[in-house]
């Protein structure tokens, strides 16, 4: 089950499309869907988590806590909407594209992809690009 939780004044439009997309990404990696919670927050909220649990005193766009059991994906993905907006401006991409990239970044970590080395980061970016193409908005 994929759920969205909002700690700020923000809400995803077309939640079902996003849920279906995340599910399809998980299946495309030969994993099964467990419980994934997205928590959308602001910089201060995520900074507190970064300091408390990871001992990092920096702003970040996403932090994911992986509770996966074998091939069943479980976890909490915290996303700073402020950071995503700023990154979208910096990278000159639409906000929703950057949001989807960050959302799927956490899931890809659960699937085993890393981003610590340059080679890992290149593979992660390539996988993000691949998975962004799987997103479809259902037309009524």
Swiss-Prot record:
Cofactor binding notes: Binds 1 zinc ion.
Keywords: Cytoplasm, Endonuclease, Hydrolase, Metal-binding, Nuclease, Ribosome biogenesis, rRNA processing, Zinc
Signal peptide (residue range): none
Location in the cell: Cytoplasm
Gene3D superfamilies reported in the protein's UniProt record: Metalloproteases ('zincins'), catalytic domain
Short name of one Pfam family: YbeY
GO function term, MF aspect, one: metalloendopeptidase activity
Any one Gene Ontology cellular component term annotated for this protein: cytoplasm
Required co-factors: Zn(2+)
EC number: 3.1.-.-
Residues given in the record as Zn(2+) binding sites: 105, 109, 115
GO biological process per UniProt: rRNA processing
Superkingdom, taxonomy of origin: Bacteria
Function: Single strand-specific metallo-endoribonuclease involved in late-stage 70S ribosome quality control and in maturation of the 3' terminus of the 16S rRNA.
HAMAP family in the cross-refs: Endoribonucl_YbeY
NCBIfam families per record: rRNA maturation RNase YbeY
Family statement drawn from the similarity comment of this UniProt entry: Belongs to the endoribonuclease YbeY family.
Protein name as catalogued: Endoribonuclease YbeY
Organism, as annotated: Flavobacterium psychrophilum (strain ATCC 49511 / DSM 21280 / CIP 103535 / JIP02/86)
Gene name per UniProt: ybeY
């Amino acid at each position: 089950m994929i759920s969205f939780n909002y700690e700020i004044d923000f809400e995803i439009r077309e939640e079902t499309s996003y849920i279906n997309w995340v599910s399809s990404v998980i299946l495309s990696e030969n994993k099964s869907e467990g419980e994934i919670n997205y928590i959308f927050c602001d910089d201060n909220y995520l900074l507190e988590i970064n300091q408390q649990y990871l001992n990092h005193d920096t702003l970040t766009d996403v932090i994911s806590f992986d509770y996966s059991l074998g091939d069943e994906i479980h976890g909490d993905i915290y996303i700073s909407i402020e950071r995503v907006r700023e990154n979208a401006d910096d990278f000159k991409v639409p906000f929703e594209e950057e949001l989807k990239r960050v959302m799927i970044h956490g899931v890809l970590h659960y699937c085993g992809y890393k981003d610590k080395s340059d080679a890992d980061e290149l593979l992660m970016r390539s996988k993000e690009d691949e998975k962004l193409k799987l997103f479809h908005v259902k037309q009524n």
